[in-house]
């Protein structure tokens, strides 16, 4: 769920998950246009992943995971829980890998500036 996702983000990036809650064109609710940078692209991919797991209620479902040697390990056998955990795990790793691209000017970015044709998932 979103709280667990936030905990993964904080653990992997050392930043508050709120730094990613309203960033670029895809971090936060909804999304349109072209991703603005690598960090925003992580959110685009995460949105696509949640879209594929939509029947699982990805924003609400509780799953199990742990941190092991600096990695996130998803622990559920349940297919829905595992799928959503994997979406969140991959995004948190992506944020950590793209920390260099984080641009404070893209936090609370106006959606009116999110233009261009959106890519397909």
Curated annotation (Swiss-Prot):
Give the tissue specificity: Expressed by the venom gland.
Q: Where in the cell is it found?
A: Secreted
For the keyword Transmembrane helix, the answer is no
Give a single Pfam family match: Phospholip_A2_1
Tell me the keywords, alphabetical order.
Blood coagulation cascade inhibiting toxin, Calcium, Disulfide bond, Hemostasis impairing toxin, Hydrolase, Lipid degradation, Lipid metabolism, Metal-binding, Neurotoxin, Presynaptic neurotoxin, Secreted, Toxin
Q: Which reaction does it catalyse?
A: a 1,2-diacyl-sn-glycero-3-phosphocholine + H2O = a 1-acyl-sn-glycero-3-phosphocholine + a fatty acid + H(+)
Which InterPro entries did the record assign?
Answer: PLipase_A2 (IPR001211), PLipase_A2_Asp_AS (IPR033112), PLipase_A2_dom (IPR016090), PLipase_A2_dom_sf (IPR036444), PLipase_A2_His_AS (IPR033113)
Output one GO MF annotation.
calcium-dependent phospholipase A2 activity
Write down the required cofactor(s): Ca(2+)
Which of this chain's residues are annotated to bind Ca(2+)?
26, 28, 30, 47
Q: How is the cofactor bound here? A: Binds 1 Ca(2+) ion.
Q: Which GO terms describe its cellular component?
A: extracellular region
Q: What class of enzyme is it?
A: hydrolase
- For this UniProt entry, what is the primary localization, expressed as one broad class? secreted
EC number from the UniProt entry? 3.1.1.4
Disulphide bond pairs = 25-114, 27-43, 42-94, 48-121, 49-87, 56-80, 74-85
How is this protein organized at the quaternary level?
A: Monomer.
What family does this chain come from, according to its entry? Answer: Belongs to the phospholipase A2 family. Group II subfamily. D49 sub-subfamily.
Role, per record: Snake venom phospholipase A2 (PLA2) that shows anticoagulant activity and presynaptic neurotoxicity. Acts as an anticoagulant toxin by inhibiting prothrombinase complex formation. Shows about 50% of the prothrombinase complex inhibition compared to CM-IV of N.nigricollis venom. Acts as a neurotoxin by inhibiting neuromuscular transmission by blocking acetylcholine release from the nerve termini. PLA2 catalyzes the calcium-dependent hydrolysis of the 2-acyl groups in 3-sn-phosphoglycerides.
Q: What is this protein called?
A: Basic phospholipase A2 caudoxin
